[in-house]
């Protein structure tokens, strides 16, 4: 049986991991085993933080809307309740942008 040399495949796999770890400090960018662990951890935190970003932005939008609505003399929960009751279908992101970019049109919503 002929001999199968796998050097190219293994080297490509290792170099792919090491390429992802450029810019890391110490052995995390040069040694394969530590680089592999660091890559796994980095990819898992990137995955979780992509989901966490959605939560943090929603909280930011709610805080902006709440601050703007309280200047008009009502609370956030009452404002959202009246929006739903009047069937105004604007999401929190759009409302937050209205607060920042177009305050007069937002004040018409609070009336």
From Swiss-Prot:
Annotated GO biological process: ribosomal large subunit assembly; translation
Primary location class: plastid
Keyword line: Chloroplast, Plastid, Ribonucleoprotein, Ribosomal protein, RNA-binding, rRNA-binding
CDD domains assigned to the protein according to its UniProt record, in alphabetical order: Ribosomal_L20 (cd07026)
Cellular component, GO annotation: chloroplast; ribonucleoprotein complex; ribosome
Keyword set includes Ribosomal protein: yes
Cystine pairings recorded for this chain: none
Places the protein is found: Plastid, Chloroplast
Alphabetized GO MF terms: rRNA binding; structural constituent of ribosome
NCBIfam families: rplT_bact
Name of the protein: Large ribosomal subunit protein bL20c
Top-level taxonomy: Eukaryota, Viridiplantae, Chlorophyta, Mamiellophyceae, Mamiellales
Name of the gene: rpl20
């Amino acid at each position: 049986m002929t001999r199968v040399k796998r050097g190219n495949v293994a080297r490509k796999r290792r170099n792919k991991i090491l390429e992802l770890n450029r810019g890391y400090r110490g052995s995390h960018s040069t040694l394969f085993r530590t680089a592999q662990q660091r890559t796994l951890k980095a990819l898992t935190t990137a995955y979780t933080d992509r989901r966490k970003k959605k939560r943090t932005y929603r909280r930011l939008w709610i805080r902006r809307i709440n601050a703007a609505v309280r200047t008009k003399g009502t609370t956030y929960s009452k404002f959202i309740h009246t929006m739903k009751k009047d069937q105004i279908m604007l999401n929190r992101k759009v409302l937050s942008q209205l607060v920042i970019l177009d305050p007069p049109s937002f004040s018409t919503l609070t009336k």
